[in-house]
C-alpha cells in the first residue's frame, strides 16, 4: 500500500480573501489542508454592553465570516473546524490592551493576537488535536526555513506587508509557519479568488480591533474603563481651553476630534498627565518641538534572529509607515531593552511597537517606553 507522505497544514480560515486564497494555494501545492476558524470574542461573556450604534456588530460579523469560511472550504474541498480561544484572548491580549490604556499608552493588540493566539493557542491546537505538520495564515509575509533558523522576510507587496505584526514571534512559532501569499500582491490575490469563484473575492479587508472588529472606540472602552473627565489645557499659556472624558481616548499628535472652538490656530495633543487627568494641547506651529524625537528606549525586545552590527538597521514605528534609519542600536546589559538613536521622526508614542529590519529581514521588535521628544531625558 502506498504511504501518504503529504504534509498536513492547518490554515487559519477567517472568512477573508487572504486566508481563502492561502488555503487554495496550499491545496494546489499538494498539502493536506484543514481549515480552522477561530471565534475569540464573546459579547455576552466579555460584558460588552454596546450602544445602539454598535448593535449591528453584536456577534453578527463573526457568524457571517464563519459562513464565508464554510463556503470557501466547501468550494476548495477541505474540512473546516471551529474553535474558540475566548479565555486565552481575554487573558493574554485584551487585559494587556486595557492595562496599557490605563497607563496612558497606545497598545497594538494585533501583535499580541499573533504572538498568543494565532501562533500559540492555534498552533498548539493544530499540532495536538489535528496533528498538523505546519500551520498557515493569510499574512502578507515570507518565511525562510533553514536547518538552524527560520527567517521572517518582508512580503512582495510592500503596501500590505504585515511583518510588523509578527515581530514578537519566537523561533519555535515561526519554524512551524507558512505564509502562502507572501509572494503575491493584493490585486493578484483577489484575481485568483475571482478566477476560482471564491465568495470572498470582493470582500473588504477587516478593520478594527483584532478578533473584535469595528466598534465605536469610546463606547467600547467605556465597558471596561470608567470615564475620567478632565481639562484640556493649552501648554503654551496654561489656560483651560476645553474638557474631555478620559485621557485614554486621545493619542499624542492627535489633531481631529478635540472639539476646541474659537482657537486662533489648529491644536494638537502634545502631552497627557494621567494623574492630573489633563490633556495638554499646543498650536500646530510648535509641532516639531513637542513631537519630533531621535532617541527611544525600547523594552521587552524580542529577537527573531540575531542582530548583525555589520548590516544597516532601520525601524518601523507604525504599520505601513516608512522605515526610519537607525544610527545606533545599543543592547542594555542584563535586560531585554535597547536604546536606539534614529533619524528625526514625529509622534513616536510609548506603548507602540518599534520593529526592526535589516535588508528584507524582520529581526524583531519591542515596546517603546520613552522618547526624547520635547528634550526629555531618557532614563534606564
Swiss-Prot record:
Residue sites binding ATP per the record: 12-19, 38, 138
GO molecular-function term, one example from the UniProt record: tRNA binding
Disulfide bridges in this chain: 113-210
Alphabetical keyword list: ATP-binding, Cytoplasm, Disulfide bond, Nucleotide-binding, RNA-binding, Transferase, tRNA processing, tRNA-binding
EC number: 2.8.1.13
CDD domains xref list: MnmA_TRMU-like (cd01998)
Region Interaction with tRNA: start-end pairs: 160-162
Enzyme class: transferase
Location of the protein in the cell: Cytoplasm
One Gene Ontology biological process: tRNA wobble position uridine thiolation
Cellular component annotations (GO), alphabetically ordered: cytoplasm
Region (Interaction with target base in tRNA): 108-110
Catalytically driven reaction(s): S-sulfanyl-L-cysteinyl-[protein] + uridine(34) in tRNA + AH2 + ATP = 2-thiouridine(34) in tRNA + L-cysteinyl-[protein] + A + AMP + diphosphate + H(+)
Record-annotated active site: 113, 210
Alphabetized InterPro entries for the sequence: MnmA-like, MnmA-like_C, MnmA-like_central, MnmA-like_central_sf, Rossmann-like_a/b/a_fold
Residues annotated as site: Interaction with tRNA: 139, 352
Keyword tRNA-binding: yes
Pfam family of the protein (one): tRNA_Me_trans_C
HAMAP family: tRNA_thiouridyl_MnmA (MF_00144)
Function statement: Catalyzes the 2-thiolation of uridine at the wobble position (U34) of tRNA, leading to the formation of s(2)U34.
Family affiliation: Belongs to the MnmA/TRMU family.
NCBIfam families: PRK00143.1 (NF001138), trmU (TIGR00420)
Protein name: tRNA-specific 2-thiouridylase MnmA
Organism: Ureaplasma urealyticum serovar 10 (strain ATCC 33699 / Western)
Lineage: Bacteria, Bacillati, Mycoplasmatota, Mycoplasmoidales, Mycoplasmoidaceae
Gene that encodes it: mnmA
Amino acid at each position: 500500500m502506498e504511504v501518504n507522505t503529504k504534509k498536513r497544514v492547518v490554515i487559519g480560515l477567517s472568512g477573508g480573501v487572504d486566508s481563502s486564497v492561502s488555503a487554495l494555494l496550499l491545496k494546489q501545492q499538494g498539502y493536506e489542508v484543514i481549515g480552522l476558524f477561530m471565534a475569540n470574542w464573546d459579547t455576552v461573556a466579555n460584558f460588552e454592553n454596546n450602544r445602539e450604534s454598535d448593535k449591528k456588530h453584536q456577534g453578527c460579523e463573526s457568524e457571517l465570516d464563519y459562513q464565508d469560511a464554510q463556503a470557501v472550504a466547501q468550494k476548495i474541498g477541505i474540512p473546516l473546524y471551529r474553535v474558540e480561544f475566548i479565555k486565552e484572548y481575554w487573558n493574554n491580549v485584551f487585559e494587556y490592551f486595557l492595562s496599557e490604556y490605563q497607563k496612558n499608552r497606545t497598545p497594538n493588540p494585533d501583535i499580541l493576537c499573533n504572538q498568543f493566539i494565532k501562533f500559540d493557542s492555534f498552533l498548539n491546537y493544530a499540532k495536538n488535536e489535528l496533528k498538523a505538520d505546519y500551520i498557515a495564515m493569510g499574512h502578507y509575509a515570507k518565511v525562510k526555513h533553514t536547518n538552524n533558523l527560520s527567517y521572517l522576510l518582508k512580503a512582495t507587496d510592500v503596501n500590505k506587508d504585515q511583518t510588523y505584526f509578527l515581530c514578537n514571534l519566537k523561533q519555535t512559532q515561526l519554524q512551524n509557519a507558512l505564509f502562502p501569499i507572501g509572494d503575491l500582491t493584493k490585486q493578484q490575490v483577489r484575481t485568483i479568488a475571482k478566477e476560482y469563484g471564491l465568495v470572498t473575492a470582493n470582500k473588504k479587508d477587516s478593520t478594527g480591533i483584532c478578533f473584535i472588529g469595528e466598534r465605536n472606540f469610546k463606547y467600547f472602552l467605556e465597558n471596561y474603563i470608567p470615564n475620567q473627565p478632565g481639562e484640556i489645557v493649552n501648554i503654551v499659556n496654561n489656560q483651560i481651553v476645553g474638557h474631555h472624558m478620559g485621557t485614554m481616548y486621545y493619542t499624542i499628535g492627535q489633531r481631529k476630534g478635540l472639539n476646541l472652538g474659537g482657537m486662533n490656530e489648529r491644536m494638537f495633543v502634545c502631552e497627557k498627565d494621567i494623574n492630573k487627568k489633563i490633556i495638554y494641547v499646543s498650536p500646530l506651529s510648535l509641532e516639531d518641538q513637542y513631537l519630533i524625537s531621535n532617541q527611544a528606549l525600547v523594552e521587552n525586545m524580542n529577537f527573531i534572529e540575531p542582530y548583525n552590527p555589520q548590516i544597516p538597521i532601520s525601524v518601523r514605528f507604525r504599520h505601513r509607515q516608512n522605515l526610519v534609519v537607525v544610527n545606533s542600536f545599543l543592547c542594555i546589559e542584563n535586560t531585554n531593552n535597547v536604546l536606539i538613536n534614529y533619524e528625526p521622526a514625529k509622534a513616536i508614542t510609548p506603548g507602540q511597537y518599534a520593529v526592526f529590519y535589516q535588508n528584507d529581514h524582520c529581526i524583531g521588535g519591542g515596546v517603546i517606553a520613552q522618547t526624547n521628544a520635547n528634550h526629555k531625558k531618557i532614563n534606564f
